[in-house]
C-alpha cells in the first residue's frame, strides 16, 4: 500500500529545512534594512546580531552554562549512613558520612567541587544529560522550538497512522 505522501505526490514537512529557509529570508530582510551609506554608519556585520537571527546552530555547539540562580538553588544533601557507600561519579571517591553534597534534579549526587565547575561550562548532568535552565535566551528559545517541532512531528505521525488504521 502506498503512503499518503506517495498517493498525493508530495513531500513530508521537513521542519529543519523550513526553519533554515525562514532564517535565510530573515537574514536577507535584515541585510537589506541594515545596509546604509549614511556618513558615520558602521559596518553591516557590526549592526547585526547573528544570535538574534538564529544563525547559532545549537545542534553542533555545546550548550551554555547552567543559570547561576539555578545552580545556587540546587539542594544540598547530607550523606547518611545508608548512602555512605555511594561514590561521586566525577571523582569516583566514596561519599563520607555527614558530608554535604549537591543533588541534581535528576537525583544524582556530586561533590560540590566536582559538579560546580561542570555546571559553569554546560547546563546538564554529566551522567544522564538532564538539562538545567540557562541564562542564554537564544538557547532557551531553541529548546522550545525543538520541543514544538517534535510535538508537530508526533502529531503528523499520529494523523498519518490514523488515516491507515
Curated annotation (Swiss-Prot):
Record EC number: 2.3.2.27
Function description: E3 ubiquitin-protein ligase which accepts ubiquitin from an E2 ubiquitin-conjugating enzyme in the form of a thioester and then directly transfers the ubiquitin to targeted substrates. Catalyzes monoubiquitination of 26S proteasome subunit PSMC2/RPT1.
PROSITE patterns: ZF_RING_2 (PS50089)
Catalysed reactions listed for this entry: S-ubiquitinyl-[E2 ubiquitin-conjugating enzyme]-L-cysteine + [acceptor protein]-L-lysine = [E2 ubiquitin-conjugating enzyme]-L-cysteine + N(6)-ubiquitinyl-[acceptor protein]-L-lysine
GO BP of this protein: protein autoubiquitination; protein ubiquitination
Parts of the chain that traverse the membrane: none
Pfam families reported for this sequence: zf-RING_2
PANTHER family, per database record: E3 UBIQUITIN-PROTEIN LIGASE PRAJA, E3 UBIQUITIN-PROTEIN LIGASE RNF181
Enzyme category, top tier: transferase
Key words of the record: Metal-binding, Phosphoprotein, Transferase, Ubl conjugation, Ubl conjugation pathway, Zinc, Zinc-finger
Residue ranges of the region described as Disordered: 136-165
Protein name per Swiss-Prot or TrEMBL: E3 ubiquitin-protein ligase RNF181
Family label: Belongs to the RNF181 family.
PTM summary: Auto-ubiquitinated as part of the enzymatic reaction.
RING-type zinc finger segments: 88-129
Phosphoprotein is among the record's keywords: yes
Top-level taxon: Eukaryota
GO cellular component, one term: cytoplasm
Record PTM Phosphothreonine, positions in chain: 165
Pathway(s) it belongs to: Protein modification; protein ubiquitination
GO MF annotation terms: ubiquitin protein ligase activity; ubiquitin-protein transferase activity; zinc ion binding
